[in-house]
Amino acid sequence: MRQTSWYVITGAPCSGKTSVICELERRGFRVVHEVARACIDRDLKNGKTRESIKADVPAFERRILHEKIRVESLLPDRETIFLDRAVPDSIAYYQIEGLPLDDPIEKSGAVCYKKIFFFERLPFEKDTVRTENTDFAARIDRELKNSYRRIGYSLTSVPVLPVRDRTDFILEHL
C-alpha cells in the first residue's frame, strides 16, 4: 500500500468541496480537481450531451474510477496534496448504481490517504455538470461515509461554514 501525504476532500454533490479546493489552490497548496467533473467538461466541449455521457452508467463509472487511479498514480507520495474526491468515492457510486464493488474496493486498497475530510451538505444546486437531485445527494452522502468507513478510514467532519472558514478548519486539522 502506498503511504501518502494526500488529504481527501469528499462529500455529496453541492457540499462546497470545489470552492474549498479552489481556495486551497489560491493559498498555494497543490490540489487535484474532481476527475469526474473534468471528464464531463471535456466531453461537453467535444460536443457530447450530458445524456450521452452518462447513457452507459457502468462504462461511465468504470471510466471515472480508472481515470482517478491514473491521476493518483502520477502524484508524488510525500507531497501534501488535496484531492477533490479520490478512488474510494467510486465505491459509493458503484453501490448506488448496483455495480459489483470488487474493483473499486480492491483499487482503494492501493493507497493510504493521510486524512479524509467529509463535507456536510449545503442546499442543493444544479449546474451544467451536476445533474443529480436532492434525494440522490442525501443517498450519496450516506454511501460515501459508509464507503470510507468500510475500508478503514475515520472521517473528519467539516461543518457548514463560509469557504475561508472551512479552509481554515481543514488546515487546522491536518
Residue locations for each model-derived region?
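Pre-Walker A (Motif I) flank of P-loop NTPase domains
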Residues: 2-6
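A glycine- and Lys/Arg-enriched "phosphate-lid" helix/loop adjacent to the NTP-binding pocket
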Residues: 98-167
